[in-house]
């Protein structure tokens, strides 16, 4: 069989623990036998990030700017325990946060729907895509513990040295404060990404903040979205037969639960972080979720939305077989191949991506699945298999589809 050609490489970002193990399995079983793979490789495993003082993460993001499409494995964001475990020089920041800040993109996450894995919210019939702003707010915040009585203020000093002050709180005892920010250019980019993605996918776009309480911070998000919609997208939305809808975040949550799905829900950074996990879990599993970072200048980074599956990795290191779900990582690769094919005019690469996803879904719907899915499936013929057996079953179906 002639391998499917590529012309421009993907940026490949390797990762940590069990997902790193699955990464190699997926390449060996589902990619390298079928695709003449071209990638520019970056090792984002924690040890190498530590060796390079995290420069490898910056380099991988800049390579994504150069080539336009990246695929990323799940990575460890170290805490105090990881500092000790890996003997790190520093508690390095989240690679995802670093990459998002450099690309200034929006993260779109949507569930992978399969028969036999039914949403916990019974009226959900269609996917709900979460669009998460990927810059600023609490993720770039400065915090301080207040030891005792005193006054805290927000201070803005302009270039002429003139100060504007706002009282935060007069403390009568110990407390805490936090200062967070965002920038208009990033919010504008977020809005454009959301409106374009809604038009590309022909879905309604919902956006929600708490502007009634946060009358300057959140209200700025609301105003920017409305201005950009009215100026740049209203006509196109009406022509496409789709709707832009704004509401308060608490009302949005209630509406989401009552809905049947089938729309994009744009969220600020923290809201998107929380709600994407809620939506993924309610649809079945974090391992059954697509995730893509879309930058305003047309770069795409595909990844799995879950962690590195530490518990399974320790079992794997003991020589035990695990039943770890690789679906989100498979769909990260397929998404990257499809986008690379679309950008480079490679129809066969797009077709391979479609068939890789179809083979994965067909395998699950036939009853062959990993332990996390067999625990929640409604199928009567479910068979729990190891990760290797699952990938082998997908390969058999993929070979038949590509024949």
Language-model features: locations:
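N-terminal alpha-helical transmembrane segments of multi-pass membrane transport
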Residues: 2-6, 18, 22-23, 28-52, ...
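N-terminal glycine-rich phosphate/adenylate-binding segment common to multiple enzyme folds
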Residues: 47-159, 163, 270, 274
